[in-house]
Each structure stands twice: as C-alpha cells, then as structure tokens.
Amino acid sequence: MPKLKTKSSAKKRFKITASGKVVAAQSTKRHGMTKRSKRSLRTRRGTALMSAADTRIVAPFMPYGL
C-alpha cells in the first residue's frame, strides 16, 4: 500500500500532541480587532485544544501525526 500524503494546509495550521489531541491557533485575530475588547484579544493569544468533533475532522488529513 502506498504512503498517505499529509494535507499541506493542515500541517501549517495544526499540531497533534503526544496524546493525540489537536492544537490550533485561536481564531478571530485577523482584522477588525479595534471593535473587540482588550480581554477578548488577550484570550486569543497562543493556541487552544480543538474539540473532539473538530479533531475527528482534522485527524485524517495528517495520517502520520505531524
């Protein structure tokens, strides 16, 4: 059976932890941030664990768990 390819878009956006959880950057930080509160912007720094439902969608894109 041939090797499976990893989706390039997924490997740029997501990381899989050793326990199999998917980590991604926080959303809502591209533009229009002057309307948002400082607290809202602070909480969107860094990364966050994705929900189980989203993990099931993303995991097949990275068969070898980059």
UniProtKB/Swiss-Prot annotation:
Residues 19-45 are annotated as: Disordered. It comes from the Bacteria. This is Large ribosomal subunit protein bL35. One of its GO terms (molecular function) is structural constituent of ribosome. InterPro entries: Ribosomal_bL35 (IPR001706), Ribosomal_bL35-like (IPR021137), Ribosomal_bL35_CS (IPR018265), Ribosomal_bL35_sf (IPR037229). One of its GO terms (biological process) is translation. Belongs to the bacterial ribosomal protein bL35 family. SUPFAM superfamilies: L35p-like. One of its GO terms (cellular component) is ribonucleoprotein complex. HAMAP family: Ribosomal_bL35. Residues 28-45 have a biased composition (Basic residues). Keywords: Ribonucleoprotein, Ribosomal protein. Pfam families: Ribosomal_L35p.
